[in-house]
Amino acid sequence: MFAMNTAYHSIVKILVNSDGSAGTGVAFTTGLNAPDGVAVDGDDNLWVVANQEDEIVVVDPTGKVIAKRGNFNGLTDDGSIDGLLFAASLSFSPNGKVLYVTNLALYLPFAGPANRR
């Protein structure tokens, strides 16, 4: 079992006791900028959202970062978001071939001072 320790930029592996209860937590990997959502692929790699870096980090079963994907590329000509902007969680499709990512970025073309009556 894994816990994202967002404030301390790390992932904690929680060992499971023989009776199924939670055991001791040990540092699994550190140095990720605000790890948040996590999904596990068919090779037991963790795919972790590092939302303050606007990227997805792939961590192998030993805790080593083996890949980084995505980033924030700015705005397109029409003002919409290009890339990840504070992604939060992710999940693989049942067959493991598609990765779904929630992106907290909002396209708000009307954003500006509120007019109150």
Regions found by a protein language model. Give the residues of each.
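Oxyanion-binding "anion nests"
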Residues: 2-15
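Blade-level signature of beta-propeller repeat domains, shared across WD40, Kelch, NHL, RCC1
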Residues: 89-117
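Structural signal for beta-propeller blades
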Residues: 9-12, 54-57, 107-109
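A short beta-strand motif characteristic of beta-propeller blades
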Residues: 23-30, 65-80
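A detector of repeated loop/turn-to-beta-strand junctions in beta-rich toroidal repeat architectures
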Residues: 8, 22, 53, 115-116
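Short loop/turn segments immediately following the C-termini of beta-strands
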Residues: 5-7, 51-52, 61, 104-106
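Beta-rich, blade/repeat-based domains predominating
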Residues: 1, 29-47, 53, 76-97
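Short loop/turn segments immediately following beta-strands, especially the blade-tip
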Residues: 14-21, 61-64
